[in-house]
Design a protein with these regions (language model features):
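N-terminal catalytic or cofactor-binding beta/alpha core of small enzyme domains
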Residues: 1-89, 94-162
Length: 163
């Protein structure tokens, strides 16, 4: 890892609660198959639970896992920005490249999402996209099927030094 870089990692599985989803549970991709704050199906559309969590259980998980994770992330972003004048959040996770339930075709290796350029400075978007596009043996796309999850959209505020 680069000197001065820090990490904030979720220590819970995304099936418990998905840290990349909005706390309200609203869909980032209305009209498309997706999973929620507490996923009820896997990426093949198959049920995850014998008995689905009710609203009270979902709220308990939100408070126990989602909220503390995002409080830690917000605090770290503020600390880094206060120290350096800028903070860059690189929100990354893995996913299968072929999931017919969620999308047609095969995903590129790198799926860079900046919510159509609203969550980071143009220079950061261009540099990241160029590096990924030029990585030997890998494919990349900018703002394709995944345009940036809730974390990217919520914290990406370039005018405030948060990218």
């Amino acid at each position: 890892m680069l000197r001065g870089a820090t990490t904030v990692r979720a220590t819970f599985h995304r099936s418990v609660v998905d840290a990349y989803r909005p706390p309200s549970g609203e869909s980032l991709y209305p009209g498309q198959n997706t999973t929620g704050l507490v996923p009820l199906t896997d990426f093949d559309g198959e049920p995850l639970w014998l008995s689905e969590p009710d609203a009270a259980e979902i709220d308990r998980r939100r408070q126990a896992f989602h909220a503390p994770y995002h409080a830690a992330l917000a605090a770290e972003l503020d600390r880094v920005r206060d120290l350096h004048g800028i903070a860059i959040l690189y929100d990354c996770h893995s996913i299968r490249s072929h999931i017919p339930y969620l999308f047609e075709g095969t995903l590129p290796d790198f799926n860079i999402g900046t919510n159509l350029g609203t969550t980071c400075a143009p220079e950061i978007e261009a540099t990241t996209s160029e590096i990924c596009a030029n990585a030997d043996g890998y494919t990349a796309i900018l703002n394709g099927r995944f345009k940036g999850g809730w974390t990217t959209r919520h914290y990406g505020r370039p005018a405030e030094g948060l990218h």
